[in-house]
Swiss-Prot record:
It comes from Mus musculus (Mouse). It comes from the Eukaryota. The active site is at E1265 (proton acceptor). GO terms for biological process: lipid metabolic process; xenobiotic metabolic process. This is Aldehyde oxidase 1. The lineage of its organism: Eukaryota, Metazoa, Chordata, Craniata, Vertebrata.
Amino acid sequence: MDPIQLLFYVNGQKVVEKNVDPEMMLLPYLRKNLRLTGTKYGCGGGGCGACTVMISRYNPSTKAIRHHPVNACLTPICSLHGTAVTTVEGLGNTRTRLHPIQERIAKCHGTQCGFCTPGMVMSMYALLRNHPEPTLDQLTDALGGNLCRCTGYRPIIDACKTFCKASACCQSKENGVCCLDQEINGLAESQEEDKTSPELFSEEEFLPLDPTQELIFPPELMRIAEKQPPKTRVFYGERVTWISPVTLKELVEAKFKYPQAPIVMGYTSVGPEVKFKGVFHPIIISPDRIEELGVISQARDGLTLGAGLSLDQVKDILADIVQKLPEEKTQTYRALLKHLRTLAGSQIRNMASLGGHIVSRHLDSDLNPLLAVGNCTLNLLSKDGERRIPLSEEFLRKCPEADLKPQEVLVSVNIPWSRKWEFVSAFRQAQRQQNALAIVNSGMRVLFREGGGVIEELSILYGGVGSTIISAKNSCQRLIGRPWNEGMLDTRCRLVLDEVTLAASAPGGKVEFKRTLIISFLFKFYLEVSQGLKREDPGHSPSLAGNHESALDDLHSKHPWRTLTHQNVDPAQLPQDPIGRPIMHLSGIKHATGEAIYCDDMPAVDRELFLTFVTSSRAHAKIVSIDLSEALSLPGVVDIITADHLQEANTFGTETFLATDEVHCVGHLVCAVIADSETRAKQAAKQVKVVYQDLAPLILTIEEAIQHKSFFKSERKLECGNVDEAFKIVDQILEGEIHIGGQEHFYMETQSMLVVPKGEDGEIDIYVSTQFPKYIQDIVAATLKLSANKVMCHVRRVGGAFGGKVGKTSILAAITAFAASKHGRAVRCILERGEDMLITGGRHPYLGKYKAGFMNEGRILALDVEHYCNGGCSLDESLWVIEMGLLKLDNAYKFPNLRCRGWACRTNLPSNTALRGFGFPQAGLVTEACITEVAIKCGLSPEQVRTINMYKHVDTTHYKQEFSAKALSECWRECMAKCSYFERKAAIGKFNAENSWKKRGMAVIPLKFPVGIGSVAMGQAAALVHIYLDGSALVSHGGIEMGQGVHTKMIQVVSRELRMPMSSVHLRGTSTETVPNTNASGGSVVADLNGLAVKDACQTLLKRLEPIISKNPQGTWKDWAQTAFDQSISLSAVGYFRGYESNIDWEKGEGHPFEYFVFGAACSEVEINCLTGDHKNIRTNIVMDVGHSINPALDIGQVEGAFIQGMGLYTIEELSYSPQGTLYSRGPNQYKIPAICDIPTEMHISFLPPSEHSNTLYSSKGLGESGVFLGCSVFFAIHDAVKAARQERGISGPWKLNSPLTPEKIRMACEDKFTKMIPRDEPGSYVPCNIPV
């Protein structure tokens, strides 16, 4: 029998597969089989949106075509029969034409590293196919499933808003106030200079959107769907069989034959279990276009929805119904809609089915508690006939008598209409407001006797608080017949707490927070129902106390918008001179079309191998044995490399590559498996058997390291003035400490490399995503015992780095190169997201202890500080992080008597490393926490204490470097003015007085960010410029393009210096072959240093060619180049910059480590929900001193992207470790970086007028890192809001808020009767699920 063919279309091209592997996902099929590499791998679990494509399906019954976005990483190709797939390549390209969304996202500066851009483009494209003029709500909803680590989202929204109606407006007009009016939050801006600069792009130049020019749905697929009789398709793979029934009868027969086989529609539940949990299903049943599974019908008893409907379709259906029917009939539907709007991203909602969501019964399911309290029923079918069962707590607990039978199929769900005097509410709390699994969720329903007030039925279910969804049915039963009033509230809360219990060591942790949410939700339910009763019967229903009403309102929610005040080019500047102009990232269009090539986009090399790692499952253990036999016996496995193979090459400097006798962290590299495919390598890695013997001590936290004196090297120390004497003369002394959690880099492109032996003289080429090609060259040369001139490292671009692609990348590259050299074959190594997060480490967790002596007016005269960073198991950059922390801890303040000491702690965690800001975001937060506490003690605002202690005019730092603080004062004054500080502070006070359960807070933070490497040698740079005879130029330099736009700026430099159009200048990438002996790209100086080298090369060429140019001033570069060639004058030049003068003597505690300082200030206003811990950033103003901006568009992108990354660090990004040292948060489903829902509603960025700095490139300043710290303005604004909540509740005295300020910490700091009501567990009496490190 001939195998059944799989037929679908990709970008209008027919695809026919005869031998389909059911385990093949669409993403690898597109990338490897079809070589469409524009669709990116970001996480593999549907959490980041990098792999978004559009699927189009034709329904022959309705004659309609449905377009929707999906995650290609979770889409089996077997599910695509009869569909049309559109990828980013299908929209347009640079060779033919661009689609308007591709053009606009690039020209609106919505790309930086560009790795997320194709996914963003496809999400927006799918929206435009359905809604050519979308609303802003539709826009933000469409992009809710896409993550970006670089831009801060705002320019992406700007690009997409150009498709909306009235795209120039924020669409948030309220009380007559709009973003286009120069009034903000009702407070008029009074200053003349607050008028914003012209936009960084011109909408008038954009291509129009013409829906008639889109790809048509393939007519062949329409004909097949309408004319060919449907029949079950079966695809057989090596391990898995895929069955696609096309009628309900065939589906029932398949389920009868294979009762244990899962029925999948979107693969969003089964897929992650298969990929991440190792679940195996030999048979998969996937229904295709079965009409009964898509039924939508209304009857007297309610609404019936087919189990095969996607969650997005359910959302649209319910939204339509609630608009048409009275509220009393649609209580359950409104509650479901509330959760559907935040559940996952658009891609997952379009893939996941209603039936799959119900049957999977995840403990944190958002819909199941609501469906259960709404008395929904499930319509089942099997060979034995139809059956109807309630969607009850017993069903959700999988009780056999209430569950589906293995051979039964869920056909549809009946959702009853609600009745008069019936109220249904939905609650959830997550780490992030959208596209995040709930920490706790709940569905609650109450029915009153006629007339209201007395409970007739009550149902309360919770998710996230147990191994299954839990019902408080006993509590509900005891409350039936009782009146609904506030007097009973405490009784209800205690009853529920007694019934819905959580063990102190419960999975997921956050136990006290979850207990508090259980009763906080119950309180909100009481308020919502009371409000509903009052609407029904104003005279006889309980009235809400005025201070309770705020608990019912959502947090501040408007559409995001921004204003920019950037530097404008001097009118006298030549029009062709690009310096200072907002020029688009020169790879922006290629990012948007998918044509930009990243490391793993490179075509496979002949006989290429794939390498993957086996990592330790223990944090500190002796390796007793390693059994490789079973793994080596698997087909396709070529070799397994251990430390024994590397021998003395297993170390380089302080780093060891593969474990020898011991492992020192979970994620320690044990061995490397090499096979002929990625799949086979990963299968073999699972078969490597390692036996461990645990060792003591196990040190995970900073406190444990201090206890065991486990430090790298000795302390670092700086001191100025006489601290001990100053403490004797101050009015007050306080001591405190703050813990700052670590942060994952979460670059969108994971660690990637391809090593290709050249087959001659031992030469080897390394194509790698790194910030430091020279270091990889050195480490590989040492490993292979080659001279460096035979090892060439090439980097075209990097899909995000932030400091995370230096040390560990080099180790991975050395091992991969060893494998390639040993076997004489190319070897590719691409880490999966979970592997990357487990192995690589991130920002150092930090502990700051401070003792401050100050006068009553707030002036700090003495400060004694101790800093500790959690370095992990190897030194890496930990000592440098401590050094930078100590040098920069003063931030914007003059402390006349300061002693600071720091230690890098050795622990059994993966080695932590550099991350944007490099110690300053942690050290600065310690200082600002101290300032804030001093303010509280003095009864002053933190802004007053900051002003009193701020550097003024020309001053010296605690390490005796002189600088001028004039720009710092300007930034502070301008920020205070632009944010209307005093007016808004008063408005916040009024808001807080009127709202008991919502509070607002505001904070203004100054910034003095030193820029420099600390060493002349580490600051040197080189460049190479060629001029060709056609008048074009090629430039090479040592900097790495990782999203910051350094290549664009270098071409701007060449254009200015050679007076050559930018279109005539090209830059291919970075290579140790063209520019040797480069330094790492980082520290905000990449454009500074390399730009000065490029400038030097250009000036050398100009000087050399000056006689020729002067003789023919009207000539072109083609003329001048030809003349030079004819005269045997070289048209190539090397440029060099030796580095800024930089030094620091740690023995003397003085030096000049930094070339200059970036100054700035940020004001943020937030709103918090005291019951749940949610927060919303309402508005942020940022003022920066940038010198002379080389490219305002790129510089604003750096400031804004860094701010959002810093905001994530200080609020929602939380690493979670087990007490045994295992990292739990290994992907976007567990680790939450900011998404579109998290950005400030208003963002106002201003640059000071240009200022001169003679030593830097065109008086510019590096802005890559400084903005991260300004994110702490959100942290301290939340602190201010929490303080207001505590003061209202009469809670005095100090309290400690550590970073990140997650919903858990916010909620638990807002102490109230509910936090006092929950049971508390004695520390030390239990083993927690997770620990802070």
